[in-house]
A protein has these predicted regions:
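Hydrophobic faces of well-ordered beta-strands that scaffold small-molecule active sites
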Residues: 4-10, 32-34, 65-70, 104-106
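Short polar catalytic/cofactor-binding loops
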Residues: 10-17
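Short, contiguous strand/loop micro-motifs
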Residues: 6-8, 40-42, 78-80, 117-118
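Active-site acidic/histidine proton-transfer and metal-coordination neighborhood
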Residues: 16, 22, 59-61, 75-120
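Glycine-rich, proline-tolerant flexible connector loops at the mouths of alpha/beta enzymes
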Residues: 33-59, 108-115
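Acidic (Asp/Glu)-rich catalytic clusters
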Residues: 1, 21-28, 45-67, 90-100
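Glycine-/proline-rich flexible loop or hinge segments
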Residues: 35-40, 69-77
């Protein structure tokens, strides 16, 4: 029978990222998810060198990046701001691929029931 891997959002440890990865490893977890939309890990700040270092650190500790969180905190409800957030989301997708995952979690917002709504 397939055993589902268990992971954690590393920010939930409320520790520096390397310490959080070590905690996940100590708990025997398979995967980690981190935010790619805030702090030092937004793609604009998170250099290729630092990405490689963190990926290798995770691997050395026996965990993998199962997902990158691409949630900007408000969904994709505004046509005007979507111009910005869709472009930022593309950079999060690139970040996820560099961290060797193809899973990005996010919240798109509330989908209206009315299929004729502009937001639908």
């Amino acid at each position: 029978m397939y055993q589902f891997p268990i992971g954690v959002v590393v920010e939930s440890f409320r520790k520096e990222i390397h310490e959080a990865i070590q905690e996940a490893s100590k708990l025997g977890l398979d995967g980690i998810q981190m935010y790619g939309t805030r702090g030092d890990f937004v793609p604009e700040k998170f250099t290729a060198e630092r990405r490689r270092e963190l990926l290798n650190f995770a691997k050395d500790n026996g965990v993998k990046f199962s997902a990158i969180c691409g949630d900007f905190g408000h969904g994709f409800m505004s046509v005007e701001s979507n111009k910005i957030y869709v472009e930022r989301s593309k950079r999060v997708v690139d970040l996820a691929l560099e961290m060797e995952t193809n899973i990005i979690t996010t919240h798109i917002g509330v989908v209206p029931e009315d299929k004729t709504s502009e937001r639908y």
